[in-house]
């Protein structure tokens, strides 16, 4: 079982005019934060391991699939490849992170997945299986082995996501060409990479007086969850809850965010959107910019 890891990347403006323009839009709101409120926990911004993610749901799915060179939906393909789905749910259980994996009726007991989770320093405290029209759902409640608590570190949540997807690609390589992760972990990489400029869409709207709703759509890549959290927290915006969907080559994110327990005002919405757009359209960052 190949292991996967994820690491964050800070947002740095190499162009001074870009940084000044963003600060001019929001004034004092753009000052570098001393602490970050993330999932109702105040933590110093020393490194990404200090950030906490208490109410995030991550979903990874393959919108289309290919098996034996035949596209799903082809008349000649009577055995269609099901859609793999990975959900990491922080809402359902206050004491554990809930992991759910579905791939039609093709998955077994997922002993390899449980072993991979143990290699990440996690314990599987409960497991069950249920069936519905979409297939067999393998559900696990997992905690950190060192503390017995649910996983709240964005880097570890991203490592779980990549490990499970890598595990699916290893045992079901037919989906590799349709997943962004296939370029790194699959036997057949995507044939048509996504244009980041075209694929990136960011919108922010009010969701009551105390929080705003942030929607992000962009090209998926390993480590994206951690990187997005870092960018948002860098301008003192707190992520209260959310959902991270990986659909084929795209990442679709929905975050409930707030600034000092209030919805984001328009200037701060613009700064956040500009910061995310600047980062997402620069998929690689020079080490010298850190």
Swiss-Prot record:
Keywords: Chloroplast, Plastid, Repeat, Transit peptide. GO terms for cellular component: chloroplast; chloroplast envelope; chloroplast stroma; chloroplast thylakoid membrane; nucleus; stromule. InterPro entries: ACR1-12 (IPR040217), ACT_dom (IPR002912). Expressed in cotyledons, rosette leaves, stems, sepals, style, and tip of pedicel in mature siliques. Residues 98-178, 213-283 form the ACT domain. Residues 1-52 form a transit peptide. Its main location: plastid. Induction: By light. It is found in: Plastid, Chloroplast. CDD domains: ACT_UUR-ACR-like (cd04873). One of its GO terms (biological process) is response to cold. The keyword Plastid applies. PANTHER family: ACT DOMAIN-CONTAINING PROTEIN ACR11, ACT DOMAIN-CONTAINING PROTEIN ACR4-RELATED. May be involved in feedback regulation of amino acid metabolism. May be involved in the regulation of glutamine metabolism. This is ACT domain-containing protein ACR11. It comes from Arabidopsis thaliana. The gene is ACR11.
């Amino acid at each position: 079982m190949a292991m996967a890891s994820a690491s964050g990347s800070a947002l740095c403006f190499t162009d001074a005019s870009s940084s000044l323009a963003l600060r001019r839009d929001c004034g004092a709101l753009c000052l570098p934060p001393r602490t970050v409120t993330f999932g109702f926990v105040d933590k110093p911004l020393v490194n990404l391991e200090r950030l906490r993610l208490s109410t995030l749901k991550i979903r990874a799915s393959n919108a289309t699939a290919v098996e034996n060179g035949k596209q799903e939906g082809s008349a000649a393909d009577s055995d269609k490849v099901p859609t793999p789905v990975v959900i990491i749910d922080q809402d359902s259980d206050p004491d554990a992170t809930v992991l759910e994996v579905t791939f039609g009726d093709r998955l077994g007991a997922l002993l390899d997945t449980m072993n991979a989770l143990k290699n990440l320093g996690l314990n599987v405290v409960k497991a069950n299986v249920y069936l519905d029209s979409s297939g067999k759902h393998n559900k696990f409640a997992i905690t950190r082995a060192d503390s017995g608590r649910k996983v709240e570190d964005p880097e570890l949540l991203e490592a779980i996501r990549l490990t499970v997807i890598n595990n699916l690609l290893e045992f079901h390589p037919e989906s590799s060409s349709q997943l962004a992760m296939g370029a790194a972990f699959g036997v057949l990489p995507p044939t048509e990479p996504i244009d980041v400029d075209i694929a990136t869409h960011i919108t922010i709207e009010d969701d009551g007086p105390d929080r705003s709703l942030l929607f992000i759509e962009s090209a998926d890549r390993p480590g994206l969850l951690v990187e997005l959290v870092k960018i948002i927290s860098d301008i003192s915006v707190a992520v209260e809850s959310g959902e991270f969907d990986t659909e084929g080559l795209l990442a679709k994110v929905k975050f409930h965010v707030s600034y000092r327990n209030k919805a984001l005002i328009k200037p701060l919405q613009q700064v956040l959107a500009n910061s995310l757009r600047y980062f997402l359209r620069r998929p690689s960052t020079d080490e010298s910019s850190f």
